[in-house]
Each structure stands twice: as structure tokens, then as C-alpha cells.
Amino acid sequence: MLIIVATHPIQYQVPIWKELAKRSNIEFEVLYLTSHGVEPSYDIQFGKTIKWDIDLLEGYPSRFSEVHCPKKITNFWSAKLPKDFKSKIKSRETTHILLLGWNVRAFIEIAMLSRMKRKFFWLRAESNDLKVNKSPIKNNFKKLFLKYFFSRIDIFLTIGKANKRLYENF
């Protein structure tokens, strides 16, 4: 079974999960840390309330964490790996894990747990090599962290050249 883990339902990913459910014989489930975006909510970047024009949960197997997570994840530390997700990842039936990002603590915990349990592990993240930190301390920490984290990934699902370069640099 393939487990896909995301922070919350994202409008441009949902059609992929719906097609996967319709077209394939691959057993999968999407696990969400929060329900952010399911109901209309105010978006600071856009300066208005956003309501998506598609149903974000219908047509594919998904569920939310059974433990309390903040409605909106605001920083790396705000979402740790829920126990129910940990059990699902450890399960014998789970063979592959697709992680959609590495921006929260829970995702790093999933990577470590996946490696310990010898699960086949994929990463798709909207990161790139274009941003340069001005602080040498931050740069060195980031290099060490990414080298460690990326060494646990079996396959990187790249999004463009800058994203691919980021992974290749480690």
C-alpha cells in the first residue's frame, strides 16, 4: 500500500489523487495533518477569504490526523507526527510512502521512521536551490540537515531544473 502524506488538502493535487483512484489498481491513502483549506479561510498572502471551487476530499481515500494539530501549520515545529499516522506507516501493509514536502517536523519524523522500517520512500517538494541564506551558520546547518535528510530518500519526484539541482547538490 502507498501512503501519501501532506500537511493539508491542496487544490491542484486533489485531481491527481482522484485519477489515481479511478485508473489504477494501486491501493493508496492520503494522510493529512490538518484540514486547512477544506472550509473557506482567510489567506494573509492574498488578503481575502479563499474557498476552492472543487471538493477537496471526495473521490479518493483520505483521512485527517486523529490527534489535535493546529488548523494551520505556521512553522516547522507546529506539527509533530500523530500516533495514528505513525501506526499506519509502521504497518506491514504499508510498502511505499510519498511525502509531499519537508517543511514540518512530522515529515522529518516520517522520513526517519520509513528508513527504520525499510519502507520505499519518495519525496516531492516544491523547493529549489535559488534562495541563498545570508547567514553562514544557517547555510552550514541547512547543508548538514539536507544531506542527512536526503540520504533517506529512495526517489525524488522533481519539479523543474532548480528543484532537481537542489537534490543533486546533496
Predicted stretch roles:
Residues 31-33, 124, 159:
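Generic beta-sheet signal
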Residues 120-122, 128-152:
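Nucleotide-sugar donor phosphate/pyrophosphate-binding loop at the beta->alpha transition
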Residues 1-64, 89-93:
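N-terminal subdomain of nucleotide-sugar transferases
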Residues 11-14, 78-80, 96-117, 123-125:
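An aromatic- and histidine-rich active-site surface loop
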Residues 164-170:
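Helix-loop-beta element that forms the nucleotide-linked donor phosphate-binding surface
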